[in-house]
Regions:
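Arg/Lys-rich, low-complexity, intrinsically disordered basic segments
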Residues: 1-98
Length: 98
C-alpha cells in the first residue's frame, strides 16, 4: 500500500492507494463507538475481530473488510497499523491475534 488518507465529505472515512492503481474506500465516517485507533478499547477490538474474521476469506487485501480490520482495528494508531499492514504484505502474513 502506498498511502492511506482520510476522506473529506465522503461516505467512507479513509481511502487506500495501492501500487497497482487500486483505490479502496473503507471505514464508517462516524462510527458510534469509534474504532480501535480512536479508543484503544481491547474488548471492543476483540469483539470486532471475532465478528469480521470472515472478511479475510476473500484473500484480497485490497478489500474494505481487510483494510478496516488491519488498519482501524489492529494497532493503537493508524501509522502503526499501516506499518504492520505493509509488513504483512511483504511476508504475506495475514493471521491476526485478538
Amino acid at each position: 500500500m502506498l498511502e492511506c488518507v482520510e476522506e473529506i465529505n465522503e461516505s467512507k472515512r479513509f481511502r487506500a492507494y495501492f501500487s497497482d492503481g487500486t483505490i479502496t474506500k473503507f471505514g464508517q465516517t462516524n462510527p458510534k463507538k469509534g474504532t480501535f485507533i480512536d479508543h484503544q478499547n481491547k474488548e471492543l477490538k476483540k469483539n470486532y475481530i471475532k465478528r469480521h474474521l470472515k472478511d479475510l476469506e476473500t484473500n484480497d487485501y485490497t478489500r474494505a473488510g481487510y483494510l478496516s480490520l488491519f488498519l482501524l482495528w489492529n494497532k493503537p494508531t493508524l501509522k502503526d497499523s499501516m506499518n504492520d499492514f505493509n509488513r504483512r504484505l511483504k511476508y504475506n502474513d495475514f493471521n491476526i491475534k485478538y
